[in-house]
Swiss-Prot record:
Belongs to the GppA/Ppx family. GO terms for molecular function: pyrophosphatase activity. The keyword Hydrolase applies. PANTHER family: EXOPOLYPHOSPHATASE, RETROGRADE REGULATION PROTEIN 2. SUPFAM superfamilies: Actin-like ATPase domain. The lineage of its organism: Bacteria, Bacillati, Actinomycetota, Actinomycetes, Kitasatosporales. This is Uncharacterized protein SCO3348. It holds the Pfam family Ppx-GppA. The keyword Hydrolase applies. Gene3D superfamilies: 3.30.420.40, Exopolyphosphatase. Domain 2 (3.30.420.150). InterPro entries: ATPase_NBD, GppA/Ppx_hydrolase, Ppx_GppA_N. It comes from the Bacteria.
Length: 309
């Protein structure tokens, strides 16, 4: 059957259409993505303003039409941290439902981490052993660890690349004092969780998902996206550490000229790099592998599991 997953994230609203059947690998059929940057549309009270809600409803309608055009039988719509943490989240959800008919499911941070872990486990298989999975989104950092398809530990931290950039790096290029302060903040937040994972033992395989990690891997020498999903891509901590000061010295325009870095994400790449560097250092990760699947695929896989029961 043809499934669609509608992901309302902090940076983008992304419709992914796949042909999927229980027991088979989902095959991508269509992708429709609009940059909305919901996290930047919050007012001083933490609410998504009327203009932001109007934009969100319009983009959801557009995605709904795209899903219909592509013959989607079952649409799985969800929202993550930008909506979850908005002070008027209930009103936003009600407006979207009233204007589009779409009922957005708001995932908790822990659910994001668990579903992303499921996607990584299915991609790498049981032979990967104990997995540590890292995912930097626009609003949050998810960390999950486990032997099975359900992680033994899963946390979500407010360390998304977009959130940190908006709150802590106001200048372009950023002021060195702000960069140092952000580095301290990131490492303090991550360090609070390390003990919870350390007691479970060292992972056999460390993987990372989503756009920020893919872009960081690309600028440090990993294969281009055009070379396909099945090319192994790694991010080495030593390479990342060498790039962080270079990114800090660049403007967002200069970062957008780097290989694999989109103009819409260039402004937040430094914050993402500081989070990635901090996580890899504190979890003593020398190298990690990029997983092509992430949260959206996890949502699809969970739906297929329920269909097969």
């Amino acid at each position: 059957m043809r499934l669609g997953v509608l992901d309302v994230g902090s940076n983008t609203v992304h419709l992914l259409v796949v042909d999927a059947h229980p027991g088979a690998r989902p095959l991508p059929a269509h992708s429709h993505k609009v940059e909305l940057r919901l996290a930047q549309l919050l007012d001083e009270d933490g609410a998504i303003g009327p203009d932001g809600v109007d934009q969100l409803a319009a983009v959801v309608r557009e995605a709904l039409q795209a899903a219909e055009d592509k013959g989607v039988e079952d649409l799985l719509p969800f929202a993550t941290s930008a909506v979850r943490e908005a002070s008027n989240a209930d009103d936003v959800l009600a407006r979207v439902r009233a204007e589009t008919g779409v009922e957005l499911t708001v995932l908790t941070g822990a659910e994001e981490a668990r579903l992303t872990f499921l996607a990584a486990r299915r991609w790498f298989g049981w032979s990967a052993g104990r997995l540590l999975v890292l995912d930097i989104g626009g609003g949050s950092l998810e960390i999950a660890y486990g032997m099975d398809e359900e992680p033994d530990a899963a946390v979500s931290l407010p360390l998304g690349a977009g959130r940190l950039t908006a709150a802590r790096l106001p200048d372009d290029p950023p002021h060195p004092d702000d960069v140092r302060a952000l580095r301290r903040h990131v490492r303090t937040e991550i360090a609070r969780t390390v003990g919870e994972f350390s007691r479970l033992g060292a992972p056999d395989h460390v993987v990372a998902t989503s756009k920020t990690f893919r872009q960081l891997a690309r600028i440090t020498g990993a294969a281009r996206s055009a070379e396909g999903l099945y090319v192994q891509r790694e991010l080495k901590r030593a390479s990342l550490e060498a790039w962080v000061p270079r990114l800090a010295a660049m403007t967002s325009t200069e970062r957008a000229e780097l290989p694999g870095v989109s103009e819409g994400r260039a402004h937040q790449l430094l914050a993402g790099a500081l989070v990635a560097e901090g996580a890899m250092d504190l979890f003593r990760v020398e190298s990690l592998e990029i997983c092509p699947w992430a949260l959206r695929e996890g949502v699809i896989l969970r739906r297929l599991d329920h269909m097969g029961q």
